[in-house]
Amino acid sequence: MGKRDNRVAYMNPIAMARSRGPIQSSGPTIQDYLNRPRPTWEEVKEQLEKKKKGSKALAEFEEKMNENWKKELEKHREKLLSGNESSSKKRQKKKKEKKKSGRYSSSSSSSSDSSSSSSDSEEEDKKQTKRRKKKKSHCHKSPETSVSDSDSDSKDGSKKKKKSKDITEREKDTKGLSKKRKMYEDKPLSSESLSESDCGEVQAKKKKSGEERERTTDKAKKRRKHKKHSKKKKKKAASSSSDSP
């Protein structure tokens, strides 16, 4: 049995393309583009001049548009100017009205100022007359005022004494309260100490009772052992007496 031949023939693509020959192109080639017909310099100049001149129809259209635009601008300007004039007139009217109102207010304020000044002068005169009357009454009542001053001083002294007494009484009360608080604070401590001593006594009693119980249990155990031993002795004696005859 021989091996199968898996080899494949190698085909050179470049050689295959050469053997096929030149490809038929459907469109224009590069050479056709390079060999295209070109205009002369004179023809180019003529075209540029035509572009600069432009068409007559376009020029007429542009002129009409410019005229219409100019008319619209003029109308808009007229409207704005008329609006500005009307606003300026309104402002002038307002200013005039303000001036008139200011004149009326100034006249009214001047009248009010004059009336207020007259009222102020009258009030000052009244105050001066009152002061004079007070001075005269003070001169006449000077001895009475001295007596009243002495009475007021004595009253003030008695009030001060009362205040000092009240303060001392309050201090005493506060001290007594503080002492009572201390006593109440110390009392629970003493009760605690008493409770501790009571606890010690209770524990000692418990220990004693426990010891007594242990003693009683020991005694009972000894008695039981003694009874058992005596019973055994009696049994032995009975058995020995029965065996002897």
Swiss-Prot record:
Keywords: Phosphoprotein. Belongs to the FAM133 family. It comes from Rattus norvegicus (Rat). Residues 89-102, 128-140, 220-237 have a biased composition (Basic residues). Disulfide bonds: none annotated. This is Protein FAM133B. It comes from the Eukaryota. The modification Phosphoserine is found at residues 82, 190-191, 193, 195. Residues 103-119 have a biased composition (Low complexity).
